[in-house]
């Protein structure tokens, strides 16, 4: 989350970041500078562009992660954690953009899982969000070969989904 001056916070009202800030974050220490109860932010007002932005941002991360191992003969130098993180960010971006396009996005990961259950996009999304929620699935016990295979699988799925989303 970036630091945004209080005077400019309203300029970001239709963004995912603003919605998540207002709806899902709590002040743990100190005074709350915002009157969250009067901001009335609705996820339905998040524009489709935010989903496109998520897909572009996470797609670039997926590409950069792939560049770490493409063309290398020795896969021992792969940073498995970075590769795993970018794969999961891409999976989550697919699900989040789907929810945004259907006006069903929610700040809570648990609620997002409930809202996407009847979708064809559920497999990758559910896997990634469940891993995030349960703090499991870290790549330490996964072989480089398995991670690279997963990267190719999600890359193909991600590209197909992205092109459909943009149309």
Language model: regions and residue ranges:
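Conserved NTP/Mg2+-binding pocket subregion across the NTase superfamily
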Residues: 1-102, 109-120, 136-167
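Short, well-ordered alpha-helical segments
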Residues: 117-130
């Amino acid at each position: 989350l970036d630091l945004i001056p209080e005077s400019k916070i309203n300029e970001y009202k239709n963004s995912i970041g603003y919605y998540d800030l207002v709806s899902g974050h709590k002040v743990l220490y100190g005074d709350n500078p915002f009157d969250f109860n009067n901001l009335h932010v609705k996820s339905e007002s998040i524009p489709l562009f935010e989903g496109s932005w998520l897909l572009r941002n996470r797609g670039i991360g997926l590409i950069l992660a792939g560049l770490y191992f493409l063309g290398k003969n020795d896969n021992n130098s792969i940073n498995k954690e970075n590769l795993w993180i970018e794969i999961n960010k891409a999976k989550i971006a697919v699900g989040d953009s789907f929810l945004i396009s259907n006006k069903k996005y929610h700040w809570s990961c648990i609620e997002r899982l409930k809202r996407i259950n009847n979708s064809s996009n559920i497999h990758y999304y559910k896997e990634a969000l469940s891993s995030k929620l349960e703090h499991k699935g870290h790549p330490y016990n996964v072989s480089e070969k398995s991670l690279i295979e997963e990267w190719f699988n999600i890359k193909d799925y991600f590209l197909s989904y992205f092109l459909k989303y943009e149309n």
